[in-house]
Amino acid sequence: MATIKDIAQRAGVSVSTASRALNDNPRISQATRLKVKQVASELNYQPNYNAQNLTRGESNMVGLVFPVTTVTAPANPFHIDLMRGISSALKPLQYEMVVAIAPNPTELLASVKSMVTQSKVHNFLIFYTMANDPVTAYLRKHQLNFVVIGHPTAQQPDRFVDNDNVKAGQAATERLITRHGVQRPVFLDSGANWTYEEARRDGYRQCMTLHQLPAITWSASRDGDIRQFLDRHPEIDGIVCADDILYGQLNRHLQYYDLPIACFNNSRLMGMLLDESERVDLQPRELGQAGVELLFNSRKHHQLVDFKIYD
């Protein structure tokens, strides 16, 4: 395997000059940089990213921070696909993933602090957005590099990758109305005030207003038993569900009503539960890849990834 010394010798420069040229040091002339890079390419030189990072005082790891998750909570297929995309994007950069998962905000923050102080992790992807979040507040305070998956809150304009969830909410509702003849769809959400749920609900409301139809919403934390709610509202003839985890929890109750359904996340879980539904594919692998690209491109503030709808 070629070394920096081999490159320097063939290019006719010192080892320090070769190193600076490969790192685009502006003190090295453009001609020398091009020459050294050409030699490196000819020798199939593979830089030691880990050594470079240690020199800068950081590890070659990216911290993935999950939302607070209870021990009994089901695994989220969306997060798994996000990680697949992140892993594929990190591989050519010779970075690895390290994960922070905790049952409460205090333990989650402690885990992130440990990553920073003990493992020298300086780059993070945050799998959620929420107001007054202690983790992102800590990362901001210490000027660490991070990107959130999802739209940041108005109070903190953090760098982010996301789908246009308002547009996705509109599109899902429109499909039920135009393809299935639905006139009274209900929007179901967890009531946990997640930004993505609120945005999809806003899109649903906008579509209903456009069609001059009444908006009907149900929240798990507010409205109680879903079957009792549907029995009280016999006019409901369709369902827009905020995500696949929520639908999985409600599936055995909703099957009884046999209503057309539009659900977010085109996961394998949805493929098994909803054979004839409108599934909004938020392309989590592409979101994960975009998150890595943005993490290492400080000149860019955000990136939107398109969604697709399958039936």
What is each model feature region?
Residues M1-N60:
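N-terminal helix-turn-helix DNA-binding module of bacterial transcription factors
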Residues A172-L213, H301-D311:
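An alpha-beta-alpha
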Residues M97-Q118, Q170, I216-H233, G248:
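Structural motif
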Residues V161-F187, R222-R227, D281-K300:
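Hydrophobic alpha-helical segments within soluble ligand-binding/sensing domains
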Residues K91-A102, Q156, V186-F187, R201, ...:
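Short beta-strand elements in bilobed, periplasmic/extracellular small-molecule ligand-binding domains
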Residues R227, D231-D311:
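Flexible loop/turn connectors
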Residues F127-K167, I245, N265-S277:
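Flexible loop/hinge segments that line or gate small-molecule binding clefts
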Residues Q46-L108:
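Amphipathic helical "hinge" segments at domain boundaries
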